[in-house]
Amino acid sequence: MVSSLIISIVLTLGQPTLAAPETPIESPSPVPSATPDRWLLMRSLQGTFPGWLLDSQRIQISGWTHASFTASSATHEQLPMGFNYRANEFLLQQNWLRIERPVVTSGPSEPTFGFRADTILPGSDYRFTLARGLFDRQLTANNGQPNRYGIDPIQFYAEAYFPTVGRGLDIKIGHIFCQYGVEANDAPSNALLSHAYTFIYNPFTHTGVMGTLKLTDTWSVQAGLVLGSDIFIDPASEPTFMGSVKWAPPTGRDSILFSVILGSGRFNQTYNFHNPEILDFVYTHKINSRLNYTFEGLYGFTTNLPDGGFANWFGILNYLTYDLSPRLSGTTRVELFDDVQGNRTGFKGPYTTLTAGLSFKPGRSITFRPEMRCDYNPDSRPFENRHGLFTTAVDVILRW
């Protein structure tokens, strides 16, 4: 009954509206360049003292609940297919809370400062995204195995924006998402319910400092010094460089992003921790007003492994998305992920996956994503001693 009531409220609200201008007790300064979307929580606070107080400080509180059900040819688990990893079960994948004070990227010439804090509390996705040294005892709390649901303070950083440096310099300090690839940790940013192996078995987060400099309207560069990949403050951390170059003409149909993660590349045998090197290339092309194509190629490697010394892997991804209407789109994803030595998934060989799904938004506060997916590895039997896996799944994202 409660879930039905929530969904009915969201359907009634439809898409979030921009806040109506009001005469504040004290006008906040500076004002963001664009008023952010008002989801259910912030809309319910409008006209109240807490709402005014948050607005006066440019602070937004929002989040979403993400739940899924996957019908599978497997009996219990679909690993190494991750995130929606349980077969024929309901999963509450993300209860995501976001508190942020966005920086102002247009208008004032003075620097502005902000922050963001993202937390999964709780959700089953935590077991894939949790960084070492950050509440990671949850991963062994269940007789040496992960709890089904856990908490992950997945991202938190302070931010400063300097509009007069180049065309704008943004600096983040804290625990931040990796800046490469197509897919993302936060569920609403993805076109499909399930994730590609190329996303699952490569880094999710970094801890350190990152700067993004806009050189022109077309070119931007990014550089950061971090403590490694998927690690917070821990004896296994080590200096690592992350950087990227992006080409994206504002009026063009194409964009290119080349990203790297470069450190020692050596497996830390003392602390049993991976320090992979990553090279990633993303190309996007807008075929027409409805049809978009995205390509990603990734190569990763690590050395100093106890057995064999060297391991490498690569992923090739093709996405095709067609917008049938403003509320309905369809996406296909074709992936080849070759875990050459079996270092990433535990089973060597090439994984071929084909996924087709829909994204339906009856209102901007709610999204349904049904999909069908086939996975196959001819060299190993990773799926409960089978070469292949077939799944049909559906999820719902309720934004609040």
Regions found by a protein language model. Give the residues of each.
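N-terminal periplasmic/intermembrane-space "pro-region" immediately following the signal or transit peptide
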Residues: V2-M81
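Outer-membrane beta-barrel pore domains
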Residues: P24, F83-N84, F128, A141-Q145, ...
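General helical secondary-structure elements
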Residues: A34, W39-M42, Q94-L97, T112, ...
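Short, positively charged
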Residues: D37-W39, D186, T345
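Basic side chains
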Residues: R38, R98-R101, R116, K172-H175, ...
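Short glycine/proline-enriched turns and hinge-like loops at secondary-structure junctions
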Residues: S109-P111, D234-E238, F273, G309-A311
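Inter-helical turn/loop segments and adjacent helix faces that build the functional surface
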Residues: D230-F232
